[in-house]
């Protein structure tokens, strides 16, 4: 399974976003979730799973080729899983550090991210329900045959996504710090008009933006204009 995809907004802008985990990539294939506490604005993402064929294509590209195409009901089920993962991600991701000093403290392990909320039991149940299904079996490359080749069902692919979500949220938890005391690797984009959630796999845990192409560059432009105005 690989991560990263081109996403777009309802307004038509598009950029490449690697959320760092396949479950988070799946969560960002449309809409995304409101922050019920009102801390962050909603990110209005365009719908990437508009049809059963879109779902087949996405899962085939990110897991294994799907043997039998999705039905309309399976598309609804997949969107329900997506919404549950998105809400859990918003609940688990702390508000981004707003100052350089806070970012340094978080990276050094001196400050845990704040602003998490309690997850909804129904969302946890949804992820667990899909994760309980058989997932895509691993296979060792290099052989001439592969057991189960061309027999990956849509339910298996969704189970793989759900299991990744389960592993992710077990790792990061929903408290202010992880079980081992380290700051969480789950972060929100620091842009005020974004709020997308990603898993920060950088060595120092200092990733700030959903994408440098979009929010990172826009922040640089704003900072440059502010410096020019102050001169």
Model-inferred region functions:
Residues 1-188, 195:
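Short helix-coil boundary/hinge micro-motifs
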Residues 163, 230-231:
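Intrinsically disordered, low-complexity regulatory regions of eukaryotic proteins
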Residues 188-193, 212-214:
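Short, cysteine/histidine-rich loop/knuckle motifs that typically chelate Zn2+
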Residues 200-201:
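Conserved binding/catalytic microenvironments
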Residues 205-216:
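Cysteine-rich micro-motifs
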Residues 214-229:
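Basic DNA-binding region of bZIP-type proteins
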